Amino acid sequence: MAMVRAHVELDERELNDQVRTFERRRMASLQRRIANQARADVPVDTGHLGQSIGEGQIRFTGPRTVEGSVHALAKYAAPVHEGSRPHLIRPRNAQALRFQIGGRTVFAKLVRHPGTKARPFLRNAGLRIASRER
C-alpha cells in the first residue's frame, strides 16, 4: 500500500493581498456594468439624471470582503427612484407659484401634487446585472 502525506501552509497576508487585487477588479467591473445599465434604464426628460449616475469608492470591509456602490447625485434622484406621496407645493420666496399649462401662464398659492410612482432604475439595474452573475 502506498501513502502520500502533504503539509500545506497558507500565507494569509499574501493570500489576502492577491485576493484584494482580484476583488477590486471584479467590484469595479460590477459597478461599471450596473451604472451603464442604470443609465440605459433611467427615465429621460433632460438627461441630467442619467448623467448624474456614477460609481462610488471601493472599500474593503474585511479580510476578503469588498463593498462598492452606484449612485445618482441629481437632487431629484430619490423621488424618481422611490416615488413620492401626494403632497402640497407652496411658494417659498413669493406669494404665488407661477407655471405654464397649455401655453398659458398660471398663478396659484397652492398646488396639490398627486405624487409619483416609484421608478427604481438603480435597483433594477443592480438586480439585472446580479442575475447574470449566478
Indicate residue ranges for each PLM-predicted region:
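Short, Lys/Arg-rich flexible segments
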Residues: 1-134
